[in-house]
From Swiss-Prot:
Important role in the capacity of milk to transport calcium phosphate. GO terms for cellular component: extracellular space. Keywords: Milk protein, Phosphoprotein, Secreted, Signal. Residues 1-15 form the signal peptide. It is found in: Secreted. This is Alpha-S2-casein. The modification Phosphoserine is found at S23, S24, S25, S28, S47, S68, S123, S125, S128, S136. GO terms for molecular function: protein homodimerization activity; zymogen binding. It comes from the Eukaryota. Transmembrane segments: none annotated.
Amino acid sequence: MKFFIFTCLLAVVLAKHEMDQGSSSEESINVSQQKFKQVKKVAIHPSKEDICSTFCEEAVRNIKEVESAEVPTENKISQFYQKWKFLQYLQALHQGQIVMNPWDQGKTRAYPFIPTVNTEQLSISEESTEVPTEESTEVFTKKTELTEEEKDHQKFLNKIYQYYQTFLWPEYLKTVYQYQKTMTPWNHIKRYF
């Protein structure tokens, strides 16, 4: 930003200098008397360094004046933002909103629905097998050995499960799948016999 201001001021100074040279003949005579010296009928022109140094000094003075004028306004702006603490408001915009659940009257965060992992799904090491006989109602479990990849996957699922246990899920999301039945005409036929 300072470079942009410097270039703008430099352009203004150069444009002003060009306009001053061509504006009036009196000013051009004064400039010529100041800049040129005649010694023994030889005109000595000022070097480019002298011209450049005078323009640069003016530009530097102008930039310092602009910077000194900008500092109080920057301080006022920073004090304004510190006073109102806008950063807290911006942080609040990125957080999830708090929603009241009408079924359990608990505060829950409105996160996108992420399917939860049940503890039954996490126990991959035990597979349940049922005996196909009608007499027996017992359920036998058979233990299997897990490979390293399956163990790593199991650990990952356990971490996910522990992480999502920290969220307060609404009660209706937990119980919807338990009470939901398929709607078919055969389930709802009332017999009047």
